[in-house]
């Protein structure tokens, strides 16, 4: 009974969420786009001519936003390269190179390298998150694993001067994640965009300029 009530409350909040309504109005696939938009507007992350990778890109709202930022016009091509990676299937987005699969696997990396053609990435975005169990220690370990995957990807594929933006949760293990970022990046900033729900412990970490590029 409690679970049913919880689901009803979530549905009510979701339907009445101003960011959900705005996403529907502006043609974005998820409200998460406004988290990236706010961070981008304050940090000036996305610029014409960049190569940008969106890790865990499904359903695609972040890639949609990046595409719009690099285009300046609808349907007119883009000034830059966008690559979306995810194990889940995603509906195509114009001008976005989508690669389905686990980016730890060789065949996926080979597809990535074909698109990159020897070039390095300017910006890596990651909205990836684990399925939370409610067990703090286990969830913290899963989150750290995902953060480390994103950092490792950035070290191998990003320009030394590039930036990595990741989602994490401000709870058990968060300080360890921040320390990991400080060890790997010259500048680390914590971001809590307005589009993050008040009840959520979600927070974003932005690392700029790699200390240990590979």
Curated annotation (Swiss-Prot):
Keyword terms of this UniProt record: Cytoplasm, Methyltransferase, rRNA processing, S-adenosyl-L-methionine, Transferase
A GO CC annotation given for this chain: cytoplasm
tRNA-binding in keyword set: no
Catalytic activity: uridine(2552) in 23S rRNA + S-adenosyl-L-methionine = 2'-O-methyluridine(2552) in 23S rRNA + S-adenosyl-L-homocysteine + H(+)
Domain of life from the UniProt record: Bacteria
TM helices/strands, residue ranges: none
Alphabetized GO MF terms: rRNA (uridine-2'-O-)-methyltransferase activity
Listed EC numbers: 2.1.1.166
Active site: 167 (proton acceptor)
Residues where S-adenosyl-L-methionine binds: 60, 62, 86, 102, 127
Subcellular localization, as worded in the UniProt entry: Cytoplasm
InterPro entries per the UniProt record, alphabetical: RNA_methyltr_RlmE (IPR050082), RNA_MeTrfase_FtsJ_dom (IPR002877), rRNA-MeTfrase_E (IPR015507), SAM-dependent_MTases_sf (IPR029063)
Job of this protein: Specifically methylates the uridine in position 2552 of 23S rRNA at the 2'-O position of the ribose in the fully assembled 50S ribosomal subunit.
UniProt similarity note: Belongs to the class I-like SAM-binding methyltransferase superfamily. RNA methyltransferase RlmE family.
Protein name stated in the entry: Ribosomal RNA large subunit methyltransferase E
Native organism: Herminiimonas arsenicoxydans
Gene of this entry: rlmE
